[in-house]
């Protein structure tokens, strides 16, 4: 059964005029390695910690500024939100299609809230806590091309022509602000697009981005802004002592106009200095140590890296299943070809290397979780190939072969073919990232023994479900298994309204 909304009634939750306050018992374990009489053993001790959560319920008017607004992702997301807001329908070869938010965790998925008369009851994910309605988002952003969003949508060839015709009047006046362009960080083939760029030194470019954010906020009368990078994949930046290893060195490098400070890092610096959440949707190392240091010092949310939309999402599910079933993946070969501008940029070896690292690391935590299958240091052979084939456009083809060892020396091979409509998969993920980032800024918590409420750590692990290479605070384990990531996100939101985590025990029926 499906219900649209619900309210929690419990002595552990209070709905106030401005906040939801909850008291939550976090049950976990602590491990101790004991030595006694010349022998050692591991001891697992159950542990319960009381947390208090406080969530502001006033939903702000949200502005979203996209770096690379005129690209396939930016134009597709903007078009999709307008189509939903205006209730647009259009003819396809199969039917009359209504605008929707399919593919969005927050807008199109559900959570289990309990059972009633022997039937499980589900509610929208977005009903857990007050969230921004995506129809109300005000979009803006930057691009190195001055093409308006209507023409960008036409160039992208993602949406049906009938829909494009209806959306054009809404999008013709949307023109990106000039963007930061550094040909050393992206493929040379992107130079033909770069007709709208911010001139000056790196310090002047940061100052211009800050000015743009302030003017956008004032012009559109928005309460909050989230900035997200959906521009070209950059090459990796060198991380060096004295260059970008600390906050002070990174800011000094900007002042000295050091060539190795990337455009994406400049945008991130501007956002952090302005107190605006910044999310990196590409695989490059935007968040160099000095930038993470800066975000922590300023308590400003940062998240990334790289949208998890198609092939990698499947991989994070399948490898988790195999290892969890006691099956040993020994070879993972992933081949992709695509024909959009992302594919064109990735044809440059340095840009591809960023993507290869992002896509290859996704199985690491699953492999390390099972020492029965894998010796220390052992890892499946893992190869990722991406080729540019202009004809297929945005319809990326992903082919994977998984070879595994099974019972008594047997071999098992799984082969997948996945046609990933690249931008149509990425757009709702971008939507979820900005909505959850905004929500995160309204949640505070404190553990038993702490005097004051505080926000989540600025490095937003809560966004991990949506990214290929989750950014985590120093010393925090990286989790890539998709089911664990979703459970973490859902259970934190449940805790904010005093609900127990969904553990699927269903003891009442046992």
From Swiss-Prot:
Catalytic activity: D-glucose 6-phosphate = 1D-myo-inositol 3-phosphate
Source taxon at top rank: Eukaryota
Gene Ontology BP annotations: inositol biosynthetic process; phospholipid biosynthetic process
Binding-site residues for NAD(+), renumbered to this chain: 70-73, 143, 180, 190, 193, 230-233, 281-282, 306, 309, 340-342, 355, 393-394, 422-423
InterPro entries recorded: Myo-inos-1-P_Synthase, Myo-inos-1-P_Synthase_GAPDH, NAD(P)-bd_dom_sf
GO molecular function: inositol-3-phosphate synthase activity
Gene3D superfamilies per UniProt: NAD(P)-binding Rossmann-like Domain
GO cellular component, as recorded: cytoplasm; cytosol; nucleus
UniProt-listed Pfam families: Inos-1-P_synth, NAD_binding_5
Keywords of this entry: Cytoplasm, Inositol biosynthesis, Isomerase, Lipid biosynthesis, Lipid metabolism, NAD, Nucleus, Phospholipid biosynthesis, Phospholipid metabolism
Pathway: Polyol metabolism; myo-inositol biosynthesis; myo-inositol from D-glucose 6-phosphate: step 1/2
Function: Key enzyme in myo-inositol biosynthesis pathway that catalyzes the conversion of glucose 6-phosphate to 1-myo-inositol 1-phosphate in a NAD-dependent manner.
Name listed for the protein in its UniProt record: Inositol-3-phosphate synthase
Organism: Zea mays
């Amino acid at each position: 059964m499906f219900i649209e909304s619900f309210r929690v009634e419990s002595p552990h939750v209070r709905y106030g005029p401005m906040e939801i306050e909850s008291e939550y018992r976090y049950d976990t374990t602590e491990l101790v390695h004991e030595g006694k009489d010349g022998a050692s053993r591991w001891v697992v001790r159950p542990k319960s910690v009381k947390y208090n959560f406080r969530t502001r319920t006033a939903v702000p008017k949200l502005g979203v500024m996209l770096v690379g607004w005129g690209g396939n992702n930016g134009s597709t997301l903007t078009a999709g939100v307008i189509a939903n807001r205006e209730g647009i329908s259009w003819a396809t070869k199969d039917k009359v299609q209504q605008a929707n938010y399919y593919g969005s965790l927050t807008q199109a998925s559900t959570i289990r809230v309990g059972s009633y008369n022997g039937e499980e009851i589900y509610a929208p994910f977005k009903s857990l806590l007050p969230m921004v309605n995506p129809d109300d988002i005000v979009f803006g952003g930057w691009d190195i091309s001055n093409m308006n969003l209507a023409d960008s949508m036409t160039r992208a060839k993602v949406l049906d022509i009938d829909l494009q015709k209806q959306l054009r009047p809404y999008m013709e006046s949307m023109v990106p602000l000039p963007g930061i362009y550094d040909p050393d960080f992206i493929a040379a083939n992107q130079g033909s697009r770069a007709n709208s760029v911010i001139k000056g030194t790196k310090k002047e470019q940061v100052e211009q981005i800050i000015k743009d954010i302030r003017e956008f906020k004032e012009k559109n009368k928005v309460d909050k802004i989230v900035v997200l990078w959906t521009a070209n994949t950059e090459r990796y930046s060198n991380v060096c002592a004295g260059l970008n290893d600390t906050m002070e060195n990174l800011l000094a490098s900007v002042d000295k106009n050091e060539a190795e400070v990337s455009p994406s890092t400049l945008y991130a610096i501007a956002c952090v200095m302005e107190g605006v959440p910044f999310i990196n949707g590409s695989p490059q190392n935007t968040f160099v140590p000095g930038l993470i240091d800066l975000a922590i010092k300023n308590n400003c949310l940062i998240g990334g890296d790289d949208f998890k939309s198609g092939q990698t999402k499947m991989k994070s599910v399948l490898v988790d299943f195999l290892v969890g079933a006691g099956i040993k993946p020994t070879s993972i070969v992933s081949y992709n070809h695509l024909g959009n501008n992302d594919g064109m940029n990735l044809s440059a070896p340095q840009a591809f290397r960023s993507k290869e690292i992002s896509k290859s690391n996704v199985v690491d935590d699953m492999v390390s979780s099972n020492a029965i299958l894998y010796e220390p240091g052992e890892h499946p052979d893992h190869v990722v190939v991406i080729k540019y084939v202009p004809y297929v456009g945005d319809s990326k083809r992903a082919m994977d072969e998984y070879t595994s060892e099974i019972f008594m020396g047997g071999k098992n091979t799984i082969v997948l073919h996945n046609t990933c409509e690249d931008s149509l998969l990425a757009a709702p993920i971008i939507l979820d990232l900005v909505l959850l980032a905004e929500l995160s800024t309204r949640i505070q918590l404190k553990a038993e023994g702490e005097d004051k409420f505080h926000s989540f750590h600025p490095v937003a692990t809560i966004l991990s479900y949506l990214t290929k290479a989750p950014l985590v605070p120093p010393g925090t384990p990286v989790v890539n298994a998709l089911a664990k990531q979703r459970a973490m996100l859902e259970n934190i939101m449940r805790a904010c309204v005093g609900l127990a985590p969904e553990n699927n025990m269903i003891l009442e029926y046992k």
